Amino acid sequence: MSLITRLLTGNNTLRLRALESLGKAGYSSHAKFSEHKPIERIRNIGISAHIDSGKTTLTERILFYTGRIAEMHEVRGKDNVGATMDSMELERQRGITIQSAATYTLWKDTNINIIDTPGHVDFTVEVERALRVLDGAVLVLCAVGGVQSQTLTVNRQMKRYNVPCLAFINKLDRLGSNPYRVLSQMRSKMNHNAAFIQLPIGVESNCKGIVDLVREKAIYFEGEHGMDIRLDEIPQDMRVESLERRQELIEHLSNADETLGELFLEEKPFTEDDIKAALRRTCINRTFTPVLVGTALKNKGVQPLLDAVLDYLPNPGEVENLGFIEKEGQDPEKVVLNPARDGKDPFVGLAFKLEAGRFGQLTYLRCYQGVLRKGDNIFNARTNKKVRIARLVRLHSNQMEDVNEVYAGDIFALFGVDCASGDTFTTNPKNNLSMESIFVPEPVVSMAIKPNNTKDRDNFSKAIARFTKEDPTFHFFFDNDVKETLVSGMGELHLEIYAQRMEREYGCPVTLGKPKVAFRETLVGPCEFDYLHKKQSGGSGQYARIIGVMEPLPPNQNTLLEFVDETVGTNVPKQFVPGVEKGYREMAEKGMLSGHKLSGIRFRLQDGGHHIVDSSELAFMLAAHGAIKEVFQNGSWQILEPIMLVEVTAPEEFQGAVMGHLSKRHGIITGTEGTEGWFTVYAEVPLNDMFGYAGELRSSTQGKGEFTMEYSRYSPCLPDVQDQIVRQYQESQGLAQPDKKKKKN
């Protein structure tokens, strides 16, 4: 048992000052934390949730109780130190988490690797990366806010990567906290088979402790910082409720677990171990979600949560991780990676995050198989580049601790490795093994950006190069038509944060233009083409003919571009087909209606013709350019715009005003719900109509309303919106005639 948490039962009172004993126990040295444990004694967990649910505060308490840090600081504390995991100055100033921070610690002789992730929708890719490499997660929910929009996003991401999770209902001390409502929302909104394994003894200011339904004991957190745990009998006034909730827990478990279900049907008695074993099995299979309660800020419920992480979340050996061996002309062969920490199999690791540190590029990796030692050579499966390992580090927020070797299941970092996030590394370059990479959403907002001083251009270029490499949702390009540098990302906040980081970290103040929506252009119906590109200018000329059809993809694929080669025979030689595809993808960068990218289109190359001397890849590329210009003229086109899922919460008296404003912004209301004087409305609103909404909501709800939005899909614009976008584009290109002239004609 950890020295910091003591169990106090009866008169056997262990009274040791925790911080005095830390030094004697060797907690100050990193060696205790970085010891290599057997696989059963390792957990890789993430802490993720909606914005402001208390993830970072919870991580701070976990680090304190496990002896990793000697004192606690609050996220927005009066001492201005900030939480350990919010290491970026901007994070401490704003009180939000922007980047995932990694750390590892020790609890009851088990090594726990923790990744603290952002809750803000603009930083979704950070959560994606973290969940991809974790074996389990703690889903933190606010006892007041309950299941919110980003909670649903995180839930979808966990489902995508099959991550088992525990739920922790935090902030029991807040006014209006209602953990029972949160549980019913988990069942209705997230479709979780969930039940309490703990109950709160009082909420709001009466929050005294928790009831453990598995052990049937009350737990109180006493002493300084709630370090002393006292077990007692369940309070008299809670015994009936505890029995009912325990029965409910057993029923939910029996539905999901065969072994317990048989005992339940045969009406045999359960032991504590039976319930714990069933909880572990169902949690790992994602058929049941145990719900714990507490308040991290008031130091209640954190130690039992750590026990639950050990008891119910899987170790790396209990999770199946697959690699894929690419074979030409065949489907990739699936290989189950060996999680044993014996080093018998070759090393396989996945790079899941890049960061430019003070000492060069830092690459975060998870080791899935084998062992990696200092001095080893590894190969990037995508580029086949060899890298020699000069330095291996484990991370504790922004501090590094050197290690000599890492085993399967460990999370670690390397310096000076040239790669992209999602790359697979192996020690054997011949096996062509790669792991499924990380899902990256498309950016939806663009802004013009320029440095305030021309002398800062070098630093500006360095910052852009670093940020685009670190964050795959942050894009950068130069628009030749308007001679502007544009950056695109997941939202206004996302781009504002990068602008502020340029000033803080590179001394390069920048000006951001107005947000621009990333519209797309697509075809309404199929359009055939037959284009001949012929050029003779002395010597060998250029000759290429292509015949085919361009057609729209189904609405659920309208962000994709497809190219299909349907040619038969040698009219279009196979070596020239890539030229046609290249020409098509080049032309897709800029549409005719509004200058935005094309998407949701399939290009079917069906036939063509070539000349034995004059045909070349370049000629076929130019033929594709000509064919698409032909389709621009002959086809029927429309503009697509990003639609956002918007969730607004405000007091009930403002419901009419909020609904009216959303309708005015072309929003479609998809649902509403109300609880205790507050209402929540869900709507789908075009992103183009959402700019300036934050100010409008504040003024119409006396500052009490709040909203979140996240990208949902692309959908066709309204006709008048499309006409306006086309007209603005034509005017900017000098193509439009003034209205007055039209009237004269």
From Swiss-Prot:
Annotated GO biological process: mitochondrial translational elongation
One Gene Ontology term, aspect cellular component: nucleus
Broad class of where this protein is predominantly found: mitochondrion
Tagged with keyword Protein biosynthesis: yes
Tagged with keyword GTP-binding: yes
GO MF term (any one): GTPase activity
Keywords: Elongation factor, GTP-binding, Mitochondrion, Nucleotide-binding, Protein biosynthesis
Job description of the protein: Mitochondrial GTPase that catalyzes the GTP-dependent ribosomal translocation step during translation elongation. During this step, the ribosome changes from the pre-translocational (PRE) to the post-translocational (POST) state as the newly formed A-site-bound peptidyl-tRNA and P-site-bound deacylated tRNA move to the P and E sites, respectively. Catalyzes the coordinated movement of the two tRNA molecules, the mRNA and conformational changes in the ribosome.
Family in the record: Belongs to the TRAFAC class translation factor GTPase superfamily. Classic translation factor GTPase family. EF-G/EF-2 subfamily.
Note: This protein may be expected to contain an N-terminal transit peptide but none has been predicted.
Protein name, UniProt field: Elongation factor G, mitochondrial
Organism listed in the record: Drosophila sechellia
